[in-house]
Amino acid sequence: MKKYISIAIDGPSGSGKSTAAKELAKKLGFLYINTGLMYRAYAYFLSINKLDINVNEMDCINAIKNANFIFNGDNVKINDNDVSLILRSNDVAMIASVVSANEKIRDLATNEQRRIASENNVVMDGRDIGSIVLTNADLKFYLNTSIQTRAKRRLFQNKDIENLDYESIYNDIKERDHRDMTRKIAPLKKANDAVEIFNDNMKLDECVQHLYEIYLKKIKKLNF
């Protein structure tokens, strides 16, 4: 039986983990899975079918199980329909925050993520990949960035938006971190065996190269 390589990348919101994971996967020729996008896909599917996870949980679970979801990096198809762009909307993000808090939905997503990793060389990012989803991943990273740096980055990215200031962004990120780290189901947590990387002073290409070099050393030890 072929052994596939799995790389888990976790970290707080705004740490650049998704972009770094995507670029690392491209560099390695691996499949990239954005687990946050998976929850958005489930949420969008339930919303267009007028199903509410808080009203009839089992109907929602069965509907998702009977649908055909295809995840490939930033591209997502549901029953052969490309929904990649619409999943990026704020409306879908709001629904996803509710759906992803459901324990049965998380179990469903976790099983799917593990199935994908068992059939592909994969780089998977999220907040509980190394600690819960892929506990036996060949390599685990935890990308960390100070709240100050994340707030500055977000302010720069949204510089054209009026009435957006550093202090409000800082407080939003701080509150988000607290929610993610203290939530009951699948909290944000660094796996004990994860390599923690502080990327405040790194450019994207430097961060990706650093991950890549660590990967090369690890793979030599594993004799792949």
UniProtKB/Swiss-Prot annotation:
Cellular localisation: Cytoplasm
UniProt keyword ATP-binding, yes or no: yes
Record keywords, A-Z: ATP-binding, Cytoplasm, Kinase, Nucleotide-binding, Transferase
Amino-acid positions noted as binding ATP in the UniProt annotation, renumbered to this chain: 11-19
Pfam families (UniProt xref): Cytidylate_kin (PF02224)
One Gene Ontology CC term in the entry: cytoplasm
One BP term from GO: pyrimidine nucleotide metabolic process
Entry's EC annotation: 2.7.4.25
Keyword check for Acyltransferase: no
Superkingdom of this protein's organism: Bacteria
Catalytic activity entry: CMP + ATP = CDP + ADP; dCMP + ATP = dCDP + ADP
InterPro entries, per the entry: Cytidylate_kin, Cytidylate_kinase_dom, P-loop_NTPase
GO molecular function terms noted in the UniProt entry: ATP binding; CMP kinase activity; dCMP kinase activity
Main subcellular location: cytoplasm
Family, per entry: Belongs to the cytidylate kinase family. Type 1 subfamily.
Annotated protein name in UniProt: Cytidylate kinase
Source species: Ureaplasma parvum serovar 3 (strain ATCC 700970)
Designated gene of the protein: cmk
